[in-house]
Amino acid sequence: MEKLSAASGYSDVTDSKAMGPLAVGCLTKCSHAFHLLCLLAMYCNGNKGPEHPNPGKPFTARGFPASATFQTTPGPQASRGFQNPETLADIPASPQLLTDGHYMTLPVSPDQLPCDDPMAGSGGAPVLRVGHDHGCHQQPRICNAPLPGPGPYRTEPAKAIKPIDRKSVHQICSGPVVLSLSTAVKELVENSLDAGATNIDLKLKDYGMDLIEVSGNGCGVEEENFEGLMMSPFLPATSRRRLGLDWCLITMGKSSRRPPTPTPEGPQSA
């Protein structure tokens, strides 16, 4: 039933990238059993401190032992004779919450829980509410019933996810992993030049986002170089040579259902 005016002894647990029993230890840093960070520490390490009424109980994802319900109200309304209810049926109805105090409100700093007391408005202190009885949530703030769902809560409306604009898509595609559109055009033009083209036509649709077409009058790879070019991916790295259409033709050859064959002289398209 303590007043949580002092800082949590586990304020450093959020700095650890590998939070666990060795990083947290037993509850020896802090005696505030209901501090938010203390609950986090107990969840990570189990509850092994002698100051807790249920030592050794594993904690659930909410930070409480699965066999007990911790609900109290720190402050003047707290009952000093508070006993943990063993079952949900033992939790008193909402009219008795003022005297029995079976719900707790945890004051925390704004950086730990950036939300306001829904009853007090924007000027209220940040709170964390837990419990199961929703019967008095429409009553004045003397009621400590929990909010309808798990917290923490924020007062401002959720921001809608904005679609990525086409310029950003192009910038993403220009990263080191995916070739940019300009690089793709450059490679196709170089392929046409390597194929002996003297006249090259370039067509782009929506700045290359939907279509990139490069056509020229080149004759393609010379027949004597074709077989060596297609087999180069299967050769040792020290034996590979950069021939003809660089790796573009190699990729098409490996992914096609029937191997490409040399074509007679005439206009070619890439």
UniProtKB/Swiss-Prot annotation:
Q: Which domain of life is it from?
A: Eukaryota
For this chain, one GO molecular function annotation is: kinase activity
Keywords attached to this entry: Kinase, Transferase
Say if the entry is tagged with keyword Transferase.
yes
Q: Name one Pfam family in it.
A: HATPase_c_3
Q: What else is known?
A: Encoded by one of the numerous copies of postmeiotic segregation increased 2-like genes scattered in the q11-q22 region of the chromosome 7.
Question: What is the similarity comment for this entry?
Answer: Belongs to the DNA mismatch repair MutL/HexB family.
Q: What is this protein called?
A: Putative postmeiotic segregation increased 2-like protein 11
Which species is listed as the source? Homo sapiens
Q: Which gene encodes it?
A: PMS2P11
